[in-house]
């Protein structure tokens, strides 16, 4: 169930072991969050170091044997893709280099045009099509079929003609993504008031509810990969913020700060790792009983506006829906970005205290001129906000993806609350991911490939019924 990277990898693996495979896909095209991503995947090389690094990232929330299995299997990711005909390029290393053994982490992606994720997805889709694996599109799964012994023997889907039942002669693999677009689950498990999302709107927690109904335990429900983003009426998904990334290639684009909804600056903007940005914005004020940083505002000047798009419009669900202007002027005309000739007037436009915002910008500018920032921002990035006009855009903690879902073991078997495998049920991908409190860039796609192969292999080896 699910036709993204995890589902496609599992299907390819099972097919190549002579299993008969049918895939159910909720949308018309498939791709899920894979196609909306930047396409990087982990492929560990120093295995012992990678195990230590990922164990530290998990903070004890993922058993050691599962991490070891992930590392060993993910070390085959490049080899496996190359064996299918893909061309691979290096992408980088650890996204949290301050954590132990970070040098062991390497990331790669499939070479090609597009955002990286689409390239990987198109390659895997072609492999599925090449094998003539049946894919039932626009057929969301509704429930798992369980016999009186507790074994999963099929799945019920629904298409335009009504409900259909698919008998599983060996097993069912759930690879249907997370709950980025399910408000009920987000309110139950995630902190803060609002988490918008960048990826596939079809990710509404279907696999979580279906697996719970047949007795699955769940884990990592409060774990996410969450950068900053901007949300506008008329778009189901948010746009990924780009300022911190843009700054690296243009020093003039450093003239920006983050302020809360009262106008106070609260963080070194460049110290935040992209996937962990959300954690700085879900602070709850126990005196005012509110989340003062939801929304926050990015304040910047004309030099930043001229430096390029302030969003990453080549990834996320909006990438084929809207093309952001290169100089941000169209979005200013839409009032998505507010502008004013002075900071005080800008504060009035966005409805925050002009004294606080003015002081925040003045204090930041003093630090720039003295090369000594109050929040410790690197002196090389201290460019004063002083070239009018001035701009503001609201920003929220957003989701690349959630990590929670049915708990699984090192063999990709989905477990009940007592740690016992539910017969005939496997999981792969971000649904019940192994990632816990801290996330490594490319870790989910690395997991889609690694546990997709594990799930496909083990499901194919199940005794037929």
Which stretches of residues belong to each language-model region?
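N-terminal Rossmann-like FAD-binding beta1-loop-alpha1 element of flavoenzymes
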Residues: 1-23, 455, 459-460
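Conserved redox-cofactor binding core of oxidoreductases
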Residues: 72-163, 169, 182-184, 231-233, ...
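Glycine-rich loop(s) and the adjacent beta-strand/alpha-helix scaffold that form part
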Residues: 159-163, 167-236, 445, 451-454, ...
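Glycine-rich active-site loop/strand segments that organize a redox cofactor
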Residues: 42-70
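Glycine-rich FAD pyrophosphate-binding loop
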Residues: 15-37
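An anion/pyrophosphate-binding glycine-rich loop and adjacent beta-alpha core
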Residues: 208-210, 217-349
């Amino acid at each position: 169930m699910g036709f993204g990277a995890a589902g496609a990898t599992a299907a390819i693996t099972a097919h190549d072991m002579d299993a008969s495979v049918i895939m159910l896909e909720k949308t018309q095209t498939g791709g899920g969050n894979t196609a909306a991503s930047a396409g990087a995947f982990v492929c560990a090389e120093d295995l012992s170091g990678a195990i230590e690094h990922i164990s530290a990232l998990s903070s004890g929330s993922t058993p050691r044997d599962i991490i070891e299995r992930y590392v060993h299997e993910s070390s085959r990711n490049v080899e496996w893709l190359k064996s299918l005909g893909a061309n691979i390029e290096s992408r980088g290393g650890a996204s949290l280099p301050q954590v132990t053994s970070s040098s062991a982490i390497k990331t790669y992606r499939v070479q090609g045009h597009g955002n990286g994720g689409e390239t990987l997805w198109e390659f895997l889709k072609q492999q599925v099509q090449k094998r003539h694996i049946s894919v039932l599109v626009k057929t969301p799964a509704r429930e798992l079929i369980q016999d009186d012994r507790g074994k999963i023997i099929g799945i019920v889907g629904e298409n335009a003609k009504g409900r259909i039942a698919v008998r599983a002669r060996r097993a069912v693999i759930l690879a249907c993504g997370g709950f980025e677009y399910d408000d009920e689950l987000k309110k139950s498990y995630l902190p803060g008031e609002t988490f918008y999302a960048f990826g596939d709107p079809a990710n509404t927690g279907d696999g979580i509810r279906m697996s719970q109904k047949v007795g699955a335990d769940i884990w990592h429900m409060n774990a996410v990969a969450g950068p900053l983003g901007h949300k506008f009426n008329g778009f189901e998904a948010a746009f990924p913020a780009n300022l911190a990334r843009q700054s690296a290639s243009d020093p003039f684009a450093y003239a920006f700060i983050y302020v809360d909804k009262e106008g106070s600056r609260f963080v070194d903007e460049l110290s935040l790792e992209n996937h962990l940005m959300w954690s700085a914005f879900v602070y709850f004020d126990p005196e005012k009983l509110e989340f003062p940083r939801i929304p926050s505002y990015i304040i910047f000047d004309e030099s930043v506006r001229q430096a390029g798009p302030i969003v990453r419009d080549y990834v996320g669900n909006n990438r084929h829906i809207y093309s952001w202007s290169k100089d941000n002027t169209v979005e200013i005309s839409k009032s998505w970005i507010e502008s004013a000739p002075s900071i005080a007037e800008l504060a009035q436009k966005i409805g925050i205290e002009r004294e606080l915002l003015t002081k925040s910008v003045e204090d930041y500018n003093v630090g720039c001129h003295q090369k000594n920032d109050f929040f410790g921002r690197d002196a090389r990035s201290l460019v004063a906000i002083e070239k009018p006009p001035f701009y503001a855009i609201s920003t929220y903690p957003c989701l690349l993806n959630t990590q929670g879902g049915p708990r699984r073991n090192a063999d990709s078997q989905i477990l009940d609350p007592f740690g016992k495998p539910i017969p005939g049920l496997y999981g792969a991908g971000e649904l019940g991911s192994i990632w816990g409190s801290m996330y490594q860039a490319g870790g989910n796609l690395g997991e889609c490939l690694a546990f997709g192969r594990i799930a496909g292999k083990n499901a194919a080896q199940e005794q037929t019924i």
